[in-house]
Amino acid sequence: MVATGSLSGKNPASISELLDCGYRPESLLSDFDYWDYVVPEPNLNEVIFEESTCQNLVKMLENCLSKSKQTKLGCSKVLVPEKLTQRIAQDVLRLSSTEPCGLRGCVMHVNLEIENVCKKLDRIVCDSSVVPTFELTLVFKQENCSWSSFRDFFFSRGRFSSGFRRTLILSSGFRLVKKKLYSLIGATVIEGS
C-alpha cells in the first residue's frame, strides 16, 4: 500500500461523490487519509524459480508413477490425465508457501486409491537436509471406467492373456491432505476434480 496526499490521481467519480455528500474541496485532504493500492512489479526471478520448482515437482510425481507401475501396481502402462500432475504441483506449492521452510520442509506420501483401498506408492522427501515441518498425503484416484474392467476380463481369458498386462487409468480427481508437524491444528484437505 502506498499513502498519497494528492487528489490529482484520484478517480473523478469518487471525488464528485464526496463533493455531492457535502464535503468541501479544501477539507478533503485534511479530513481523509487516502490510500492507493499499488500492484508491485512481478519479480522475474521469483516467477522463473516458481515455474522451475513446479516443473521439478511434476517430474518427481511422474517418476513416482513410472517406478510404481511395475513394482507396486503390476501394470505395463499408467495413463495420466493431461495437466493432472501440473495441477497437483501447483497445489503443493500453494500449500507449502505458508510454511516456515517452504517446500524444503515437505515430506509427501503418494498413494493410489483403487476400489476404496489406498495403496502406498512412494514417500518423497523434498530436501533431506531440512527437518520436515509438514506432511502432504497425495491420493491419486483410479478412473471408474467399466470398459477397462471388461477389457481386462476379456483379454485375461483369451489367447492374449500371456502377453497382456493391464493399463491403469488415473482419474482427474485427487486428494491432497496437509498435516503440520509443529502444530496441533487440524489437517487441510484439498479435493481436486
From Swiss-Prot:
Top-level taxon of the source organism: Eukaryota
Major localization listed first in the record, in broad terms: cytoplasm
Localization in the cell: Cytoplasm
Coiled coil spans: none
Gene Ontology biological-process annotations: negative regulation of signal transduction
Family as reported in the entry's similarity comment: Belongs to the DDIT4 family.
Keywords assigned by UniProt, alphabetized: Cytoplasm
Function of the molecule: Inhibits cell growth by regulating the TOR signaling pathway upstream of the TSC1-TSC2 complex and downstream of AKT1.
PANTHER family reported for this sequence: DNA DAMAGE-INDUCIBLE TRANSCRIPT 4-LIKE PROTEIN, DNA-DAMAGE-INDUCIBLE TRANSCRIPT 4 PROTEIN DDIT4
Cytoplasm recorded as keyword: yes
One CC-aspect GO term: cytoplasm
Species name: Pongo abelii
UniProt xrefs under Pfam families: RTP801_C
Protein name in the entry: DNA damage-inducible transcript 4-like protein
Key word Secreted present: no
Alphabetized Gene3D superfamilies for the sequence: RTP801-like (3.90.470.40)
